[in-house]
From Swiss-Prot:
Keyword Nucleus: no
Similarity annotation: Belongs to the DapA family.
PANTHER family, per database record: 4-HYDROXY-2-OXOGLUTARATE ALDOLASE, MITOCHONDRIAL, DIHYDRODIPICOLINATE SYNTHASE
GO CC terms: cytosol
Function: Catalyzes the condensation of (S)-aspartate-beta-semialdehyde [(S)-ASA] and pyruvate to 4-hydroxy-tetrahydrodipicolinate (HTPA).
Gene this chain is encoded by: dapA
Active site, per annotation: 133, 161
EC number: 4.3.3.7
Compartments, record wording: Cytoplasm
Protein name: 4-hydroxy-tetrahydrodipicolinate synthase
Length: 294
């Protein structure tokens, strides 16, 4: 269902920290023109943690409106309370979203049984396709392959965004899950290797800046042409790394403004503006990448 380059979309804000519709529309048009496969609206990169639930819902709905059927929209619906995750998911049931990305509960560090029961409860309360999201560096808990395998038996749990950066994970998960279960990288720097090992795509931060290039990398990889895929990816490696010098999405928003994709790189506290030293590294990376910006 979801393969190739999927962008973890930034949430553009004006100088007052309110959502900038003009910039959001420009970003969506950029991804449509670049043939990005889908948009994830309000995930980690979209600053879900600093938005109210009402804002969260409104931005996803605005993204759907502006996309107007031209590109699939996946709603971020994760929460560290199961009832809240279910409530948020149900709000999008008849909205037109193509599916949901649901991160493991953060901060409260549930057991594997707790994680299983959490996602089981979500699955049983919606018909929307669900993509699990494992990012232990952010959440403080790790969704292990054995638990993923148990969850893969639910018809609407269709895949996982695996963002540990541990390539051995893909082997372990592939051995345990059903054959049509989607394996999607959540780490740009290792995404191509992930795909060579059997992954179907990446939910990408880099695609905010290099949409065409990420689309081309994934397209080549899915065809088995890893020579051309690696040729492009080599140019982007500095960028993959520079975008995480500071916590995401600090660097990517600054760079999106720098290249004219958004009007302002405003973030909400506790996220703070990019450091001068990081700007230097980002400028170096963007020059090396030699991007084709629409």
């Amino acid at each position: 269902m979801f393969k190739g380059s999927i962008v973890a979309l930034i949430t553009p804000m004006d100088e007052k920290g309110q959502i900038c519709r003009i910039s959001l529309e420009k970003l969506i048009n950029y991804h449509v023109a670049s043939k990005t496969e889908a948009i994830v609206s309000i995930g980690t990169t979209g600053e879900s943690a600093t938005l109210s639930q009402e804002e969260h819902i409104n931005i996803v709905m605005l993204t759907l409106e502006l996309a107007d059927g031209r590109i699939p929209v996946i709603a971020g619906t994760g929460a560290n309370a199961t009832t809240e995750a279910i409530s948020l998911t149900k709000r999008f049931e008849k909205s037109g979203v193509a599916g949901c990305l649901s991160v493991t509960p953060y901060y409260n560090r549930p057991t594997q049984e707790g994680l299983y029961q959490h996602f089981k409860a979500i699955s049983e309360n919606t018909e929307l396709p669900q993509i699990l999201y494992n990012v232990p560096s952010r959440t403080g808990c790790d969704l292990l392959p054995e638990t993923v395998a148990k969850l893969s038996h639910f018809n609407n749990i269709i895949g996982i965004k695996e963002a540990t950066g541990d390539l051995s994970r893909i082997h372990k998960i592939k051995e345990l899950v059903k054959t049509n279960f989607l394996l999607i990288s959540g780490d740009d720097a290792t995404a191509l290797d992930f795909m060579q090992l059997g992954g179907q795509g990446v939910i990408s931060v880099t695609a905010n800046i290099a949409a065409k290039e990420m689309m081309e990398i994934c397209s080549y990889a899915l065809k088995g042409d890893f020579i051309n895929a690696r040729s492009i990816n080599k140019r982007l490696m500095l960028l993959h790394e520079a975008l995480f010098i500071e916590p995401n999405p600090i660097p990517v928003k600054w760079l999106a403004k720098k290249i004219g994709l958004i009007k302002s790189d405003t973030l909400r506290l506790p996220m703070t503006p990019v450091l001068d030293s990081t700007r230097f590294q980002l400028e170096k990376a963007i020059q090396y990448a030699n991007l084709k910006i629409s």
